[in-house]
Amino acid sequence: MRTEAQISDAIRLALGSDPGLVLWRNNVGVAEHWNGRGVDVVRYGLAPGSADFVGVLLPAGRFIALEIKSPTGRATPDQVTWLALVRKMGGFAAVVRSVAEARAAIERARGGASE
């Protein structure tokens, strides 16, 4: 069984050559930074639950969000909320588990679906 990281890498490589799509890898998390007096907590990424890939579908400039999961992985409540917000605002959002699912999702987005 492939891990989410392996699936994510395969999707990035497969979709990276699509001239009608621009995708960015979005890392979300928390880190600790020693500031000389103590530890600062640093949060990074767009927002809690934001998708693994965010991007723009050309030529209209439609926002797209892809959440990558392993075959048995489940979206967290924060991820479900993020994906719903993207759809509500007119973007396209999907959970995908393979390159084939990612390609199919992009084609649905091109057809006007919100997912």
Please give the residue ranges for each predicted region.
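Catalytic phosphate/metal-binding cores of nucleic-acid and nucleotide-processing enzymes, i.e., regions
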Residues: 1-115
